[in-house]
C-alpha cells in the first residue's frame, strides 16, 4: 500500500473514532460513593409499578404520570408464575408482554431497575414462584435443591435473553438488575444458592450489568441476604431513622451509593383488617431526608399498586394465615385506578427541590362512571354444573388429595364422599389443625351447612342418613408470598372425620371455572332450571350496557357474602364485603364493551341476597371491616 493510500486509511479511521458515540455505562463509584452513568455522577429517584397488576391499555397512562411526577426510573418485578403457568409453557402475550412494557418505559424516557426474581414476594401468589414446583412435595424452595435450581435455570434461560438487549450497556434503559429478593428474611440462608444465581445472571446478562440485592436493615437479614459480587441495598419506610437505616447498609457496603430499594409510601390490606394508610407528610419528609444525604431511592414501594385480578393475590403468615385483598391500592401516590393523589403532589414537591421536573401538566385522573344498579338472576347451583366445570370427571382416592397432587394451580376443587352411617344426633364434621387450605364450603345432600376455614372454624355439626352425599368446595385464597411457610399446599391437607372417624372414598373434582367462562359459559348456554335458594355456592348472571362509553368503574355487592366476579370473561378477582375492608372491585374500562351487552358472571360461595343486585359506582369503597366471625 502506498503512502497516500495509507494516509487515507489512517484519516478515515480517525474520523470513525471521533464519530463513534462514547460507550454507555452504569457503574458503582466506591471512591465518591455514587453511581456513575456514562461517567458522570448519578442518583435515581424511582417508583415501583407492577405491569401484572395493571391492564395493558393503562400502562402508558400510569407510566406517563410517573414520569411527570419527576421520577427518573421505575422499578419492575417479573413474576415467574405469570409467564410459566405450567412447566415449559410460556406466556408473554397481551397483558403479559413484558418486553412491550419495558419498551414503553424507554419510549417515555424512564430508566428501569429490574427485579426478575426468581422469587419476588410482592404479596403476589407464592411470591411469584410457580405452584407447579410443589408437584414435587419435598422440594426446598429458594435453595440449592437440584430440582429447584433446574426449574430456575430453565426459566432464566427463557427470560434473561429477552432482557439482555434492553440493558443500558447495550443501548437499552435497564440500569440494574436485582438477584433474588429479601433473601435474608428467608430461613434457608443458603449462600450456595445465591452464588448459583449470581453465576447464572452473569452468564446470561454479561459482566457489565450492575447486579444488586435488597434486604431489611436488621443484621441477620443483611448477613444472609448479601453476597460478594452483588451490591447490597436496603429497604425501610418513613417510620425509620434514615441515618440508622443507611448505617445498616454501611455495615455491609462501607463505600458506594446509599440506596433504599423499597421506601414504603403506604401498605397493603389484608382481608378482615382496617384499610392501611400512611401520612403524606411523613412520606414526603422521609424522602427529603434521604435525598439530602445524596441517596438513591426507589419510592416507593408502591408508586402505583394496581389490582390483584383473578387469583393472583398472595398471603402472609404472621401467627396466622393472612390473605391479601384484591385491591393493591397500597395508599400509593397513584391510586388503584391510576389517579394522582395528594401524596403524589407532596412527593413531587420534594423531588422539585433536588432536580428539575418535566415541563407540562400532570395527566388528569381517568374518567369514571357510575353505571348504576344491575339485576342478576340465579343461573345454577355449582353442584348442578359439575359436568361443565369438570368435563373430564372426578379423580377417585381413598383419602383427599391436595391441589398440587392433582395439578390444580388456582381456584377451586370439590371433594365429595358419602356419610358412612346414619347420623340422627348432630355429629362433629371436623378437620385436623391447619388442614383446610384455605376455605371449605360444606354441603350435605346439596344443602349448605356452613364454612370451614384455615386458622378459623374447623368443625361443623351435621345430621344425615347412610349414603347421603357430602360435598366440600375448597377455595385457594392465595399462596403465602413471604416468610418460611412459602411451600403452601392447598386443598384438604388432612382427612375430614365424622366424630373422629375418618371419612374415606373421595371423588375429587378439579374445577376449570375460568376455562368455561372464557368460552362463553354460562351466557352462551341454555337457561338452567335452578332452586330458588340463595345459600351455598351458585352462579348468578346478568348483563348491562354502557351509555356509549367504556369508562372505569367500581362494583359494590350489597347483601352478598363472598365470591368471584367475571365481566366479559375477565376475572376481576375476589369480593368479600362481609370480611372487609374492601367493599368494591375495580373494573377497568378496557374490559367493557360499547354498543353490545356486558356479560356479568358471579360465583357466590356462601349466600346471595334475596334480590341479587350489583351497584356500579364512580368511586371505590375501601374502609369497612367487620369481625372475623361474620
Question: What annotation goes with each model-predicted range?
Answer:
Residues 50-68, 87-106, 280, 425-431, ...:
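Aromatic- and glycine-enriched glycan-recognition loops and surfaces
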Amino acid at each position: 500500500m502506498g503512502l497516500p493510500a495509507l494516509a487515507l486509511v489512517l484519516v478515515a479511521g480517525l474520523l470513525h473514532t471521533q464519530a463513534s458515540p462514547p460507550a454507555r455505562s452504569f457503574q458503582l463509584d466506591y471512591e465518591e460513593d455514587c453511581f456513575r452513568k456514562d461517567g458522570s455522577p448519578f442518583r435515581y429517584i424511582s417508583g415501583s409499578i407492577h405491569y401484572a397488576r395493571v391492564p395493558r391499555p393503562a400502562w402508558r397512562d400510569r407510566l406517563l404520570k410517573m414520569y411527570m411526577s419527576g421520577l427518573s426510573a421505575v422499578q419492575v418485578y417479573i413474576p415467574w408464575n405469570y409467564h410459566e403457568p405450567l412447566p415449559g409453557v410460556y406466556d408473554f402475550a397481551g397483558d403479559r408482554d413484558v418486553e412491550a412494557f419495558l419498551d414503553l418505559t424507554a419510549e417515555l424516557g424512564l430508566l428501569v431497575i429490574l427485579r426478575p426474581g426468581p422469587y419476588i414476594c410482592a404479596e403476589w401468589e407464592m411470591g411469584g414462584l410457580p405452584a407447579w414446583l410443589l408437584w414435587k412435595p419435598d422440594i426446598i424452595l429458594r435453595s440449592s435443591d437440584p430440582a429447584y435450581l433446574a426449574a430456575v435455570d430453565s426459566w432464566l434461560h427463557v427470560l434473561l435473553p429477552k432482557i439482555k438487549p434492553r440493558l443500558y450497556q447495550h443501548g437499552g434503559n435497564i440500569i440494574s438488575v436485582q438477584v433474588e429478593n429479601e433473601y435474608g428474611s428467608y430461613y434457608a440462608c443458603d449462600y450456595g444458592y445465591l452464588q448459583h444465581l449470581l453465576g447464572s445472571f452473569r452468564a446470561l446478562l454479561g459482566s457489565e450489568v450492575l447486579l444488586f440485592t435488597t434486604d431489611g436493615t436488621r443484621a441477620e437479614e443483611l448477613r444472609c441476604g448479601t453476597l460478594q459480587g452483588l451490591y447490597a441495598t436496603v429497604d425501610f419506610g418513613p417510620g425509620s431513622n434514615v441515618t440508622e437505616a443507611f448505617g445498616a447498609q454501611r455495615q455491609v457496603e462501607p463505600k458506594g451509593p446509599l440506596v433504599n430499594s423499597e421506601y414504603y409510601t403506604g401498605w397493603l390490606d389484608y382481608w378482615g383488617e382496617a384499610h392501611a394508610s400512611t401520612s403524606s407528610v411523613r412520606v414526603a419528609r422521609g424522602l427529603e431526608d434521604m435525598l439530602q444525604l445524596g441517596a438513591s431511592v426507589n419510592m416507593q414501594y408502591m408508586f402505583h399498586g394496581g389490582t390483584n385480578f383473578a387469583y393472583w393475590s398472595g398471603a402472609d403468615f404472621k401467627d396466622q394465615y393472612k390473605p391479601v385483598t384484591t385491591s393493591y391500592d397500597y395508599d400509593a401516590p397513584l391510586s388503584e385506578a391510576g389517579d394522582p393523589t395528594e401524596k403524589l403532589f407532596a412527593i413531587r414537591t420534594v423531588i422539585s427541590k433536588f432536580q428539575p421536573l418535566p415541563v407540562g401538566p400532570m395527566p388528569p385522573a381517568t374518567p369514571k362512571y357510575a353505571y348504576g344498579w344491575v339485576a342478576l338472576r340465579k343461573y345454577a347451583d355449582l353442584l348442578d354444573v359439575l359436568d361443565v366445570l369438570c368435563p373430564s370427571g372426578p379423580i377417585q382416592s381413598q383419602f383427599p388429595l391436595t391441589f398440587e397432587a392433582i395439578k390444580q394451580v388456582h381456584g377451586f376443587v370439590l371433594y365429595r364422599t358419602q356419610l358412612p352411617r346414619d347420623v340422627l344426633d348432630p355429629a362433629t364434621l371436623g378437620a385436623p389443625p391447619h388442614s383446610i387450605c384455605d376455605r371449605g364450603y360444606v354441603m350435605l345432600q346439596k344443602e349448605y351447612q356452613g364454612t370451614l376455614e384455615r386458622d378459623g372454624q374447623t368443625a361443623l355439626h351435621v345430621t344425615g342418613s347412610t349414603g347421603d352425599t357430602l360435598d366440600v368446595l375448597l377455595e385457594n385464597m392465595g399462596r403465602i408470598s413471604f416468610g418460611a411457610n412459602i411451600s403452601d399446599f392447598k386443598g384438604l391437607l388432612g382427612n375430614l372425620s365424622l366424630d373422629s372417624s375418618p371419612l374415606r372414598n373421595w371423588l375429587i373434582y378439579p374445577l376449570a371455572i375460568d376455562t368455561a367462562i372464557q368460552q362463553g359459559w354460562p351466557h352462551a348456554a341454555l337457561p338452567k332450571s335452578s332452586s330458588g335458594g340463595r345459600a351455598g355456592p351458585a352462579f348468578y348472571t346478568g348483563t348491562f350496557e354502557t351509555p356509549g362509553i367504556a369508562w372505569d368503574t367500581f362494583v359494590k355487592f350489597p347483601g352478598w357474602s363472598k365470591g368471584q366476579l367475571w365481566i366479559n370473561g375477565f376475572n376481576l378477582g375476589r369480593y368479600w364485603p362481609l370480611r372487609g375492608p374492601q367493599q368494591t372491585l375495580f373494573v377497568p374500562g378496557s374490559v367493557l364493551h360499547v354498543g353490545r351487552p356486558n356479560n356479568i358472571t358471579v360465583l357466590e360461595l356462601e349466600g346471595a341476597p334475596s334480590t341479587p343486585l350489583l351497584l356500579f359506582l364512580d368511586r371505590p369503597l375501601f374502609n369497612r371491616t367487620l369481625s372475623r366471625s361474620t
